[in-house]
Structure formats: structure tokens, C-alpha cells
């Protein structure tokens, strides 16, 4: 038992050191806090470094804890997605939520908005939120975790939002999206190979994040995952 405990402690120290290496790299400094929190959480739940790199690569390209999707396509307004135009026009999204952090908005008002969008089955209005930029029903599920963490208050703290998003990521990868991890694990027997990190970043983009221009972004995120893995393990 004592030997097992020592092994667990050594593993945790090693994993924490990997994340510290990653976030100390200036290339990833813009998402330092988010990458550190989610990365350590994934390691705490036993995920391999190459898989962690794949998740973090997608988060690096996708979002920040508690942050709303921006609808401010100032230079190229023609590129603004239709669902964000709808949100801007009907709900004043650009002013109330666009590019803001969840700690700065009213939880009660956001609750009311999400109930309306859910009732319409997300057919016209939705928005990305959080480190994964969850949309539609997944935004609603995340919001329920926000509400649970803040205990009914109208404002949520960053620590509470972080806890909620951590539970969301782990919850998805251990339930409805577990098949993605299982598929990756089956097809990548050598988890310590850089290629395993690339494949993690790629499949997570293709089947978990699914952004616009998915195929091209999956290649980029696979490359980022491989680079992150190299930084973490050197």
C-alpha cells in the first residue's frame, strides 16, 4: 500500500511538472491559466500525456474558461455566423455577452435567455461558451453546472466557473463522448509516441469540438497537440 501511494505521488508530481513546462512556454501564455487547470484535472483522472495534449491543443485554439463567443466581426462582418447575427438582433448579445467572461454577467438573466433558446430547440439562436466553446444543449448543460457551483447567487466566481467547466469536460469524456477516447486508445497502442498526440488533437477536433472548417482545423490542432506533447515531455 505504501509503495502504491509513493508511486501515485511520483506520478502526480511528474504530471504537474509536464503542465508547468507547457504553460511556461511563451507560445501558450495567452491561455496559461485555462491550460494549467484543465491539464492538471485530466492528469488527476488518469489520462495519458498524449491525450491531455490533444485536449489542451483544442482548448488553446477554441476558448477560455467562462468566456462567451465573440460576435464582433468588425473587419469582416460577412463572416459572422447567422446564429450570432440572430442573437445580436433579438437579444442584444453583442452588448450583453459577446467576448465577456461569465463572472461579469447576471446568472439569472442568462438563465432566462437559455430557457428561451432551449424552448426553440436552438434552431436559430445559440452561442459558444467556456474553454470548449460549448454550444446549444451543451451550453445549457454547462450552465446547470455553473448554477450548481454558485448556489443560486446572481454572480459566479472564476473559481466556481473553473470547477463547473472541469466537471463538464470530465463528465463528457466519461459518458457521452467516452467513445472518442476509447477509439483513440484502441488505435494508438503506443501512447508515448508524438503521433498519438497528433491523433488525439485531430480526433477531438473532428468528433468532440466540431468547429467550422473541421477537417483543416483538425490538422492544425493535431500539429499543436504534437508540439505541446514535445514541450511537456522533453
Segments the model singles out, each with a brief description of its role:
Residues 19-37, 60-196:
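Peptidoglycan-targeting cell-wall enzymes and recognition modules
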Residues 49-66, 169, 203-205:
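Short, functionally critical alpha-helical segments immediately adjacent to catalytic or ligand/cofactor-binding
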Residues 184-234:
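Active-site or metal-binding loop neighborhoods of secreted/extracellular toxin and effector enzymes
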Residues 42-46, 122:
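Helix-boundary and loop/linker segments of multi-pass membrane transporters
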Residues 39-43, 170, 205:
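Amphipathic alpha-helical segments within well-ordered protein domains
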Residues 2-15:
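Cleavable N-terminal signal peptides of Sec/SRP-targeted secreted and luminal proteins
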Residues 36-39, 52-57, 198-202, 222:
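Short, well-structured alpha-helical segments
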Amino acid at each position: 500500500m505504501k509503495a502504491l501511494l509513493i508511486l501515485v505521488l511520483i506520478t502526480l508530481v511528474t504530471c504537474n511538472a509536464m503542465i508547468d513546462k507547457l504553460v511556461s512556454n511563451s507560445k501558450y501564455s495567452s491561455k496559461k491559466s485555462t491550460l494549467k487547470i484543465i491539464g492538471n484535472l485530466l492528469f488527476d483522472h488518469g489520462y495519458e500525456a498524449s491525450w491531455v495534449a490533444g485536449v489542451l491543443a483544442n482548448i488553446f485554439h477554441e476558448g477560455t474558461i467562462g468566456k462567451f463567443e465573440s460576435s464582433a466581426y468588425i473587419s469582416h462582418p460577412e463572416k459572422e455566423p447567422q446564429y450570432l447575427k440572430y442573437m445580436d438582433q433579438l437579444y442584444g448579445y453583442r452588448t450583453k455577452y459577446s467576448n465577456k467572461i461569465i463572472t461579469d454577467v447576471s446568472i439569472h438573466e442568462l438563465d432566462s435567455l437559455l430557457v428561451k433558446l432551449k424552448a426553440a430547440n436552438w434552431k436559430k439562436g445559440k452561442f459558444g461558451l467556456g474553454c470548449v466553446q460549448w454550444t446549444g444543449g451543451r451550453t445549457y448543460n454547462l450552465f446547470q453546472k455553473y448554477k450548481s457551483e454558485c448556489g443560486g447567487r446572481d454572480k459566479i466566481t472564476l473559481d466556481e466557473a473553473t470547477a463547473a467547466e472541469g466537471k463538464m469536460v470530465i463528465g463528457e469524456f466519461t459518458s457521452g463522448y467516452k467513445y472518442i477516447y476509447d477509439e483513440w486508445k484502441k488505435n494508438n497502442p503506443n501512447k508515448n509516441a508524438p503521433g498519438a498526440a497528433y491523433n488525439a488533437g485531430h480526433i477531438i477536433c473532428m468528433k468532440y469540438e466540431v468547429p467550422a472548417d473541421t477537417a483543416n482545423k483538425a490538422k492544425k490542432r493535431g500539429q499543436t497537440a504534437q508540439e505541446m506533447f514535445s514541450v511537456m515531455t522533453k
